[in-house]
Amino acid sequence: MKALTAITSILFVICIPMLLLTTDLRFATNYIRLYEYGFNKYEVSAATGLDNEELLSVADRMVTYFNSDEEFFDIDLFNQREVTHLKDVKGLIQLAYRLQLASLAYIVVYIVINFVLRRGAFWRGLARRLIWGSGATIALLAILGLWAVIDFDSLFLLFHLVSFSNELWQLSPGDKMLLMFPQGFFNDGALFVAAAAIGEAVIIGGIAWGILALRGKANYKKVLVHANGEG
């Protein structure tokens, strides 16, 4: 029984950073204003020859494609290699969606089952696990951030080797996809997701710490009342 409790608790802690990161990734992927920000910042219009309205139209169609059942992105702007790579990107995004739903489902089921079984005694343990999960989120992103500062190229290469089973991501410098989405575009997107996840982790951890502090004070008062009663 103790082993099962430990395993389910560890999975709960793991699901916290998974849920935060996939949720923020989903938001970033679908938030068209982030695309607009990147296009303006990196002067994509000048690089591609497309005006801002055309760029946003392509981005909007791309977001729709990521959330559709279409196998390929039907657009003349990209060549076959780019379109095929975009299919792989869509698969990665859809995987993130599934991980988001799976982690959310596990967290909800875990909380409901433990509350039914343990009632009020569960809240202290839940608060601790939320703090651990929040801490794990911040630690993971801190490690990745430090790695990126020390050797970004190796992190970038490892991400693509793990994420894709082919070399289609190695596009030519003149390909429209690279011109539309330069490396800085993805760096900013990653920073947005990381900052959002860290902020959410701090909030969750802070609330959980507050719950522990309040319950600790309540228990302390009960002990004092009990001691005074006996006295």
Regions found by a protein language model. Name each.
Residues 66-103, 185-197:
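Individual transmembrane alpha-helix segments
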Residues 167-225:
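Terminal transmembrane helical module of multi-pass membrane proteins
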Residues 34-76, 82:
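Membrane-interface interhelical loops and short interface/amphipathic helices
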Residues 147-174:
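Juxtamembrane non-transmembrane "cap" segments at the membrane-aqueous interface
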Residues 2-7, 104-154, 204-227:
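Juxtamembrane interface at the cytosolic side of transmembrane helices
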